Amino acid sequence: MNSFSTSAFGPVAFSLGLLLVLPAAFPAPVLPGEDSKDVAAPHSQPLTSSERIDKHIRYILDGISALRKETCNRSNMCDSTKEALAENNLNLPKMAEKDGCFQSGFNEDTCLVKIITGLLEFEVYLEYLQNRFESSEEQARAVQMSTKVLIQLLQKKAKNLDAITTPEPTTNASLLTKLQAQNQWLQDMTTHLILRSFKEFLQSSLRALRQM
């Protein structure tokens, strides 16, 4: 499949993505990055749930690439040798063997729970990214809103919703305050690390979901 253009991000993309929360009685919504003909063109096969999730993740990855480009252009964080020290102060979601998402020991149900839980944990970090960009402010918002939609899509696919852990709002609020109180260098480094880790998490998720 072709990759999406980052120009697809914007207020219109937000609205289209949020249409997914409307009742099923309404016509099938067009996801950000989708062509309407993929959804409702006469005499054509609509995208399956798995295909829509796949396409949606690649759309978000496109947005992350655009945000990383701005981050790298405005600072030297992408080449910094001090990032390991800063990363130790974050608790960004990562895939591990026990999560069942790798080819060895793959477990669909366990992996899906990990993906959804990880995305929910990333939400506070995506909130932190808001107002961290000047020329890509709308893209940062699009990544955040598109991730919320992705979580909804995956929750419909999950069989064991009770196993999904949702972060405590008070914990997230405290973490957000702490991140925003950092000095400028640490804020820039945190932005870089969040984008890099989120990209890696989504790429691992995409590979696992293609096995389901």
Swiss-Prot record:
InterPro entries: 4_helix_cytokine-like_core (IPR009079), IL-6-like (IPR003574), IL-6/GCSF/MGF (IPR030474), IL6/GCSF/MGF_CS (IPR030473). It comes from the Eukaryota. Cytokine with a wide variety of biological functions in immunity, tissue regeneration, and metabolism. Binds to IL6R, then the complex associates to the signaling subunit IL6ST/gp130 to trigger the intracellular IL6-signaling pathway. The interaction with the membrane-bound IL6R and IL6ST stimulates 'classic signaling', whereas the binding of IL6 and soluble IL6R to IL6ST stimulates 'trans-signaling'. Alternatively, 'cluster signaling' occurs when membrane-bound IL6:IL6R complexes on transmitter cells activate IL6ST receptors on neighboring receiver cells. IL6 is a potent inducer of the acute phase response. Rapid production of IL6 contributes to host defense during infection and tissue injury, but excessive IL6 synthesis is involved in disease pathology. In the innate immune response, is synthesized by myeloid cells, such as macrophages and dendritic cells, upon recognition of pathogens through toll-like receptors (TLRs) at the site of infection or tissue injury. In the adaptive immune response, is required for the differentiation of B cells into immunoglobulin-secreting cells. One of its GO terms (molecular function) is interleukin-6 receptor binding. It comes from Cercocebus atys (Sooty mangabey). This is Interleukin-6. SUPFAM superfamilies: 4-helical cytokines. Its main location: secreted. The lineage of its organism: Eukaryota, Metazoa, Chordata, Craniata, Vertebrata.
